[in-house]
Amino acid sequence: MASERLPNRPACLLVASGAAEGVSAQSFLHCFTMASTAFNLQVATPGGKAMEFVDVTESNARWVQDFRLKAYASPAKLESIDGARYHALLIPSCPGALTDLASSGSLARILQHFHSESKPICAVGHGVAALCCATNEDRSWVFDSYSLTGPSVCELVRAPGFARLPLVVEDFVKDSGACFSASEPDAVHVVLDRHLVTGQNASSTVPAVQNLLFLCGSRK
């Protein structure tokens, strides 16, 4: 799925989950609308699966409904994406990321390319779990020297399924040797380290994407 294409705009890959646990409607809305002002956007999911939007509210339900009717509402297959064609990578808050993106070999390949080329990456909330797939052959994490944020344990334990989570981002980051920081639950908190922007939760989406746009603008 690609947004309306305009010439001379850099390309941004927006990676979302295709798992049943879904994609945060509000986070995706902000990611898509803000990034569309600066990029030609391509949305991709594992297997090209349709996105299941969660946390749909009265304020965003109409946008989600209209979005589904767009000609570009079918995601591309993540497996067929060539990361070299994109200038930026954006991952909204996706509870489903823990199920599919966090173990995606295709996304790992793209992230390794972005890391080696120091291309801008932005991951928000549960979408930060997607970064965990990017391990080297020696099982070290490509972001092990970075500072980042993501859902804190304090935020995650409030959900009934905490004990069944396949991955806890805060633990993974710390165990991998990277520096993890978090503010109080639900607070807006964004970390920028080199070319990597991370947001603690869906509430942090707007300032996180603003930082991505700043990073891309400073490279022109």
UniProtKB/Swiss-Prot annotation:
Task: Name a single GO cellular component.
Answer: early endosome
Give glycosylation sites per the record.
N201
Molecular function as annotated in GO? glyoxalase III activity
Point out the signal peptide segment: 1-38
Q: Where in the cell is it found?
A: Secreted; Early endosome
In terms of InterPro entries, this protein maps to: Class_I_gatase-like, Prot/Nucl_acid_deglycase
What keywords are annotated for this sequence in UniProt? Endosome, Glycoprotein, Secreted, Signal
Task: Please give the subunit comment from the record.
Answer: Homotetramer. Component of the FERRY complex composed of five subunits, TBCK, PPP1R21, FERRY3, CRYZL1 and GATD1 with a ratio of 1:2:1:2:4, respectively.
Q: Which family does it belong to?
A: Belongs to the peptidase C56 family.
The UniProt function text for this chain reads:
Component of the FERRY complex (Five-subunit Endosomal Rab5 and RNA/ribosome intermediary). The FERRY complex directly interacts with mRNAs and RAB5A, and functions as a RAB5A effector involved in the localization and the distribution of specific mRNAs most likely by mediating their endosomal transport. The complex recruits mRNAs and ribosomes to early endosomes through direct mRNA-interaction.
- In Swiss-Prot or TrEMBL terms, this protein is called Glutamine amidotransferase-like class 1 domain-containing protein 1
Phylogenetic classification of the source organism: Eukaryota, Metazoa, Chordata, Craniata, Vertebrata
